[in-house]
Every structure is written in structure tokens, then in C-alpha cells.
Amino acid sequence: MGIFKKEHKSLLLTGLFSLAFFITPLYIQAQDDSGSESIKPEMLMDVNTSKDFFKSLQISVIEHPIFLSSEANLAQSKEVLNIAKAPRRPQVSLFGSTTNRMQSSYDDRFSFFESSPIKDRTSTGILIEQLLFDFFSTKYQINEARNNLLAEEVVQEQKINSLLLKMITSCLDTASYDILKDLLRDSVRRHTEITEKIRIRVESGRAPTRELSRANARLAEAEAKLLRIELNYDSAKAEFMQLMPNIKACSQMIDLDQSDLSMDENQVIEMAINSNLNIKEVDLRIKAAKENVSKQRSNFWPRLNLTLQGDLYNPEYYMTKKLEEHDIYLGIQFQTELYTGGRKNSQLRIAKEQLNQLSYDRSTLAKDITSNIESLLSELKNADNRVKAYESAFNANGKSRDNLNLQFETSNVSLLELLQAERDLIESAENMVFNQRSVILSGYTQKAILGQLKSYVENSGK
């Protein structure tokens, strides 16, 4: 009877051990899954944080010196247009003169009937001139100034566009390095723990000394990488604070929905050529240059002015306030330059070459934009797959590290394998973070090239 009980007892213990053997991997797997999910950092801002950031972005732009400088340039262009319009209005001038005759040919003649017409004279007067016709020279000058003003408005918008892209890039940089900084600090901590375990094994004679040397090398490598990331973060943060001093440095990336992007190559290239702000500026400069060519041609022709002049004078006294006589003149002034030493021809040639230069610049710009758009599209078309691939690689390395940690507790797993798992995890983390940054930045760059970034930021901040 006792033997029967002992046999049943041994069978019962065997069953319990078997059950524990099968349950333990399930528990380990569950623990592994939860652990690997928890190490993945939250890289993107939520909706409310993004909205607040875009609002702050708009405020930072209008306070930035680059924007204020563009405002000053725009104000100058407006005044240049006013100057171009001025010849169409009456030109009023006031003048005065006093004359003291020093010598005259009449003084040497002995004639009773001849005398100098002027001896001493003091006069003052007012002159009013009104342009009648100048073969459209003033019209061309006004059109040139107006097109340059419109070009300056586009330049201001482009500066805002570039400034917004620079600020967003700075946000992505600070967020990327901040995320990696936290991951690397955690990794250095784990490197230190593993190295300490290896040191204990070496001192107790259970592992060769070379393992401790390799562990110290891996630890130093992790610390150096952390130092590099911290330096990059400090540099990115300093640039961020210069651009946006009133905003807290980004700790997460500002996202961009892929559905907001244009993915059709032909459509995007056409949109870029038609709506790119640099192209718009050059087109307006070309129009202004054409008006300048027409203006230089019209300068070969004469000008007609209507003049009205009134004089008060005293024909007998030098430097006197008693101006007893007056004259009033009304006439038409005909003015033309017969010979200028080749100046007008040179001015015309310069105007033509400026027009040619702008045309060539536009062609070059169109090629550069087309190339940039094609490059961005090739990156954006595979963006989702790349993001998922790098996230999967990060999660897989996280699971591998967790599995090795769990196996270390139950078997004699090499601690150097744990260090290698830590290195693989950090490398996959860097790839994941920088790939996410690259994808987001490509989207915002497309918006900037298409001239849509300013409106996108304004709408996203509402």
C-alpha cells in the first residue's frame, strides 16, 4: 500500500513539473511582449500639442529678424513705386539768385547808344513743370517698379516659408536627439549592470579576463555614443532657442499626415513649377526686366514738358529785398539728348542681358525643383513601409534582448551576448528615430517647395 502511494506521489510530482515547464515559456513570452512594447518611445506629438506648437510657430515667425527685414525691404519697394509715379504729377521748385556784373565787353566800347543790358540784379521765382509726353518712359518705369514690388511680396512669403521649414527642422532635430538621449541613458545603465555581472564572474574564476575587457570596451562605446548624442542635442537645442526663444524645446516630433501630400509625380512637378515661390519671384523679375528694356528704348526719344514760371526781380540792385518787377512765362519745353558718349546704348544692352540672365536662372531653378520633387517623391512613396520596417526591427531587437535577459536567469547565457543585444537595440533605435525624422521632414519640404507650408501651418494652428 505504501509503495502504491509512493508511485502515485512520484507521478503527481512529475505532472506538476511538466505543467510548470510548459507554463513558464508562456509566462516568459507574455512578459517579453509587454516589455518590448514598453521600451518603444512615443515619438510623435498628440493633436493638441501639435496645434499649440503651430500657433507658437506663427508668433515666432513674425517676431524673427528675418521677417522684420523682409518687411523693411517691402516698404522700400513701395517707396520706389511712388518715386516712379512722381513724374506724372506737377513738379514745383522755388529758386532765387543775385547777380553782380564783374566785367563786360560793353565796358570797353565808347558808344552813347550801347550799354550792358544787365548790371546788378536780384531775383526769385517759382517754376512749375508738368510732363506732357515722354514716349511711355514713365509708364514703363512704373510697371517695372510695380513688378519688383510684387516680387518683393513673394520674396517675403518665401522667407516666411523657409523660416517655417527651418523651425520645423529644428524641432525634429531636438526631438530626435532627446528621444535617443533617453534611450541611450537607459542602455548605458544596462551596460553598467551587465559589466558588473561579468566582473563578478571573472573575479570568481567562472569567466576569462578577456570578457571583462570586452565588456568595458562595449560600456565605453555606449558612453561615448551617449556623449555624442547629448552634444548634438545641446547644439540642436541652442539653434532651436535662437529661432523660437519663447517655445519649449521639442521632446516629440511634429507629425504630418501622408494624406496631405501629393504623390502623383506629373501632378506634383506641374504644381511646383506653377506655385513654387522662387519661380513666381523670377517670373515677376522677368516682367520687370522687360519693362526696363522698353524704358531704356524710350529714353532715346525726346521729352515734352509744360512749364509755368513766375519771377520777382530788381534789375538795378545787388542783394536787395525790394523786388519791384515781375515776369510770368508759360511754355512747352522740348528736351532730347543728341549725344551721350554711348551711355544710352550701354544701358539698353545691360537691360537686355539682365533679362537673359533671369531667363537662364528660371530654367536652372525649374530643373533643380524638378530634381528635388522627384527625390522627395521616391522617399515619400515608401515612407510607410520604411517606418514600419524600422519599428519592426526595433521591436524585434527589444524582444531578443528581453529573451536573453530571461534566459540568463535560467541558463548560462553569455553576458557578452547580452551586450551585443544592447548594441543591436540601440542601433535599431537610431535607425528608427532618424528614419521617422527623415520621412516627416520630406513631407514638410514638399509643402515648402509647393509654396503651401505657410497656409498648412496656419490651418493646423486653428
Regions found by a protein language model. Give the residues of each.
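Extended amphipathic coiled-coil alpha-helical segments
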Residues: 68-87, 129-131, 137-172, 176-200, ...
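Periplasmic alpha-helical coiled-coil/stalk elements that build and connect Gram-negative outer-membrane
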Residues: 2-3, 10, 32-37, 43-51, ...
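Hydrophobic, lipid-facing positions within transmembrane beta-strands of outer-membrane proteins
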Residues: 122-128, 268, 328-334
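Sec/Tat signal peptide C-region and signal peptidase I cleavage site
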Residues: 24-30
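Bacterial Sec-pathway N-terminal export signals of envelope proteins
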Residues: 30-93, 103, 208, 244-287, ...
